[in-house]
Every structure is written in C-alpha cells, then in structure tokens.
Amino acid sequence: MQISTKFTIAIHLLAAIAYFSEGYRVTSEFLAGSIGTNPVIVRGVMLKLRGAGLIETKRGPGSIRLLRPLSAITFLDVYRAVETGSGKALFHFHEHPNPQCPVGRNIHRSLDGMLLDIQQRFEADLASHTVADVLNRIHACARKEASPAATSAKASEDIQAPKKG
C-alpha cells in the first residue's frame, strides 16, 4: 500500500498557509515554491482541500485561508480529502472470485473483517495526529536552527576542508 504524494503535499500546504498567514501573500505559486512542485499540482490539491471544507480560496493574490484551526484538522481529514473520500474502503477487492473454488467462494467471508479492522486502526491512528502537531514541530525545528549553538555548528561545517575524493 502506498499513499500518494497528494497527502504530504496537502499537509505541507496547510502548514504553510498557517505559517505564512501573517505578512505574506500566500498564493499557489508561493506554495509551489515551498513544496518544490508545479503550481498546477498545488491547485489540484487545493481544490480537494476546498471541497472537503478545509480551506477557502478566492480569485486574486493571497486569498487562501484555513476554514478550521490546524488543531481541528486531523491527518484523517486530509487523507479523506485527497486520497479516498469519506467512508471509502482502503482495500479494493477483485471483482469476481470463482464461486466453484473453495478459496474463491470463501475469500470475502474470510478476509473482509480483517481488512476492515486494519482500515479502522489505520484511520484511528490518522485521526490521532493533527496538522497543528506538524506546525509545532516546524516551529521547534526553526527555533533550533536559529539557536547560537546551531549557527556555530553550521559555521564550523562550512569552513571545514573539503574531503578528498
């Protein structure tokens, strides 16, 4: 199973919208620069977030805003917005198992409950994390980068002799 980059792009977008809400014109181009992707991809993800009621967008520069506090936006909200939609199955079953085969005839009865249990645990874990958690970590990392010890360590890294190749 693999979740597409739309999920992490959406988390990045939401965190960046909040982080840069004061003093910046937050546009799809601005966000694309932060993410390192094409503005068209950003606009596609924003469309999904808007459809899920997480952001509001208006024509014109810097007219993107959060509709809920980041502490009220869970990873599950984001996942459902950009990946599956609400209430959709995580696992997709092959369409026509052979009813003449004992495995084919009984696969749904044997596997469906297990897959549902896995999905419920996955969704509960996603629901336990918020975008505010991510932004808090971003702020902590930024403070650490700005500390005198980090600046001093970075300066000493910059002046080290190059390694022999």
Language-model features, listed with the residues they occupy:
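Basic amphipathic alpha-helical segments that dock to polyanions
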Residues: 45-50
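C-terminal regulatory/oligomerization modules of transcriptional regulators
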Residues: 92-165
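A short alpha-helical element within helix-turn-helix/winged-helix DNA-binding domains
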Residues: 25-36
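Short amphipathic alpha-helical interface segments
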Residues: 11-22
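Conserved segment of winged-helix/HTH DNA-binding domains
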Residues: 70-96, 115
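Short alpha-helical segments that sit at the start of domains
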Residues: 1-13
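Short coil turns linking two alpha-helices in DNA-binding domains
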Residues: 38-41
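Beta-hairpin "wing" of winged helix-turn-helix
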Residues: 53-67
